[in-house]
């Protein structure tokens, strides 16, 4: 077996929930963070360098999440982690609801697994990633690619690959302000009435068929939610204003991406440019600087180079 001394992992961003799929549904999209791990000869335990627009916000010591995941895998296989140089190139905005933490977890675990000689299977890496993150909706598509629905069973996690119709275009509006996942979770109730639970179950089923067929009426109906969005939207300035603009421009529906504050609209190639312009203008009218772009679904997941 050839022992690697360096490995680079490219991990896609993710948009989670898609409305009713709270903590269980997510899709990989075409924004990326890259993590390079190189075994070091020096006695320095870890040296981390970060590049990218938001690099100053990322920890460069042992508290770095990618490095913590790297160490966690070695602990899991009962080995001492090597001294390592970590180079991170950021392409996924931080604290925006695009799975930046999931990229770090997946990148760190995969980097460690490769340098350790691949002792863990992809499923074992996935299980460890879910355990670290606490929920599967971001880490699973970040690892595997595509749109994934994940559920826990008595035998472990079950992952379904959800077909995404090629005519459906995801448009993301990324604002210049952050929203912590902790704050976004704090406003969510701990208990729900039965009718709201039934509502989400029904609409998630409709959404999955809409994603598969590209049928606009199912997408519009399927993205409705009563579990998290009604409580989180108040944390996002101009949410209803931007949503109205997106729908008037032809989007099927607009939802919060992950914990927010990024907003996700699903549309098609005929209306995507109008939706982009409408969402940009609407948020700017609310005094929010935003980057709005049409992305693609990443079907490969995390890859090595």
From Swiss-Prot:
GO terms for cellular component: cytoplasm. Pathway: Amino-acid biosynthesis; L-threonine biosynthesis; L-threonine from L-aspartate: step 4/5. Its main location: cytoplasm. GO terms for biological process: threonine biosynthetic process. It is found in: Cytoplasm. Gene3D superfamilies: 3.30.230.10, GHMP kinase, C-terminal domain. This is Homoserine kinase. It comes from Trichodesmium erythraeum (strain IMS101). The lineage of its organism: Bacteria, Bacillati, Cyanobacteriota, Cyanophyceae, Oscillatoriophycideae. The gene is thrB.
């Amino acid at each position: 077996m050839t022992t690697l001394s360096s490995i680079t992992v490219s991990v896609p961003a993710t948009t989670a929930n898609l409305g009713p799929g709270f903590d269980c549904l997510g899709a990989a999209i075409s924004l990326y963070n890259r993590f390079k791990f190189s075994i070091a000869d020096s006695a320095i335990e870890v040296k981390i360098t970060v590049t990218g627009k938001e690099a100053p916000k990322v920890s460069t010591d042992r508290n770095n999440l990618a490095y913590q995941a790297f160490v966690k895998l070695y602990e899991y296989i009962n080995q001492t982690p090597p001294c390592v140089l970590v180079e991170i190139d950021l392409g996924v905005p931080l604290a925006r609801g695009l799975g930046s933490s999931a990229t770090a977890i997946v990148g760190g675990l995969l980097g460690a697994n490769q340098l350790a000689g691949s002792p863990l299977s992809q499923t074992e890496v996935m299980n460890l990633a879910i355990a670290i993150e606490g929920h599967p909706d971001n880490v699973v598509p970040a690892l595997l690619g595509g749109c994934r629905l994940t559920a826990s069973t008595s035998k472990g996690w079950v992952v379904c690959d959800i077909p995404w119709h090629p005519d459906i275009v995801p448009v993301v509006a990324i604002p210049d302000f952050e929203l912590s996942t902790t704050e976004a979770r704090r406003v969510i109730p701990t208990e729900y009435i039965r009718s709201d639970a039934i509502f989400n179950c029904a609409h998630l089923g409709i959404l999955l068929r809409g994603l598969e067929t590209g049928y606009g009426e199912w997408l519009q109906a399927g993205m409705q939610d009563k579990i998290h969005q009604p409580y989180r939207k108040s944390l996002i300035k101009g949410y209803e204003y931007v949503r109205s603009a997106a729908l008037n421009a032809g989007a099927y529906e607009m939802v919060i991406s992950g914990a927010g504050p990024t907003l996700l609209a699903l549309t098609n190639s005929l209306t995507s440019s109008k939706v982009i312009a409408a969402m940009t203008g609407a948020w700017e009218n609310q005094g929010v600087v935003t980057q709005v772009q049409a992305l693609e679904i990443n079907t490969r997941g995390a890859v090595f180079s």
